[in-house]
Amino acid sequence: MAESATDSGNVAEQYSLLPKLMPNLDRHLIYPLLNFSADEDAEQPLDQKKLLLELLKPTNMTDFVGQLYQDVHNLDDMPDEYKTKRDQVLQRRDKLEEETSKISGLLDDENVVTNLRSDKVQNLAYLKDTHGVTVEMVNQLYEFGSFQYSCGVYPHAAELLYRFRVLVRNIQEREATWGKLACEFLSVNWDSAIEEINKLKETIDTRLFNNPLAQLQHRTWLIHWSLFPLFNHEPARESLTDMFFSPSYINTIQTNCPWILRYLAAAVITNRNKGRNSNQYQKQLKDLIRIVRQEGYEYSDPVTDFIKALYIDFDFEEAQKKLSETEEILKNDFFLLGAADQFVDAARHLISESYCKIHQRIDIKDLSTRLGLSQDEGEKWIVNLIRDTRVDAKIDYKAGTVIMNHPPQSVYQQVIERTKGGFFRTQVLSAAVAK
């Protein structure tokens, strides 16, 4: 269980998730995380360059790796070994280009493409019988795609892997889909990336059905990889959040990667403005609270602690403290930096709404302090809140208070509300006993 931060200056470092995320990502996807700095103008530290050098050494990005080596060791020129490797990479590229030229030319031919169908076996048979294409030629597409990926030529790699996938249906097809997904991320093609995520999700559900361990591992990878579009592509946030909350994926998070709760909490909170009154949003918020409560012994950080303080402990002072720590964490997290301001704004609304629900007379100065705002800022905030949420409330500017008009609930309604849950549980137990 994560300990509470004692020094707000190092809270982001203390709760860094890099060691948890990296084992579940490809090295090309790890690069932007290691290269990330909240301060874009800051000079890259030597230790960071050393990490990047070790990360990218196995790739074919020879010029970039050679430059990193030169910087790390303070050399005037790139070492000869990198120049030699660059020549070897270029020779290998030319060879693969030549070996795949025939099949690439065929797949560029509109007359050939119009004869291809959804049946991959039939496609390969057609190309083999009509144009003399061999299985080896098809495999060379995969080899060339993997090579280009290693070189960092992501758009071309994506095209080669896509063409390979049109013609095969085996384990390599799944590997090609993972590779194409990474290419789409690194080329910032979010719509195509979402298509690949959906393909992988279906593949994991259907083709790994008889191998639960492999299914769990692949779902874990897909959850981590999906963090890239989750906060970088607004249209995808809702569908990916739905995926994370689906039974198989929420079970994977609880079993294999509870630290993903940070990102799930951020996604739910930042979705507040879109659907705070929708049944789906309210259900997700309730599910999030339940899971944070269940997993508190296994994982916690200021983001999940904020949820706990606000919705489980109803401790508004603690919620404000955790929100302050959360803001720092978000601004130092590669995935969450762009959502930091949106999260803080939505979180303040949630604090205000919860506070107003349980108090009839609210001191503006006190609520402003709980929101981390000055009294003037707090007053404006409350005015906007009353207007936006259309709650029945009046501001007494002279007394510096807000008077909430909570409609009285009849005794009968209170009894109904309190017994409704018990009645439902009794029905479930009765049904279980009857079986």
From Swiss-Prot:
PROSITE patterns: PCI. GO terms for molecular function: translation initiation factor activity. Residues 241-409 form the PCI domain. InterPro entries: eIF3e, eIF3e_N, PCI_dom, WH_DNA-bd_sf. Transmembrane segments: none annotated. Signal peptide: none annotated. Its main location: cytoplasm. One of its GO terms (biological process) is formation of cytoplasmic translation initiation complex. It is found in: Cytoplasm. GO terms for cellular component: eukaryotic 43S preinitiation complex; eukaryotic 48S preinitiation complex; eukaryotic translation initiation factor 3 complex; eukaryotic translation initiation factor 3 complex, eIF3e; nucleus. Pfam families: eIF3_N, EIF3E_C, PCI. Keywords: Cytoplasm, Initiation factor, Protein biosynthesis. Component of the eukaryotic translation initiation factor 3 (eIF-3) complex, which is involved in protein synthesis of a specialized repertoire of mRNAs and, together with other initiation factors, stimulates binding of mRNA and methionyl-tRNAi to the 40S ribosome. The eIF-3 complex specifically targets and initiates translation of a subset of mRNAs involved in cell proliferation. Belongs to the eIF-3 subunit E family. Component of the eukaryotic translation initiation factor 3 (eIF-3) complex. This is Eukaryotic translation initiation factor 3 subunit E. The gene is INT6.
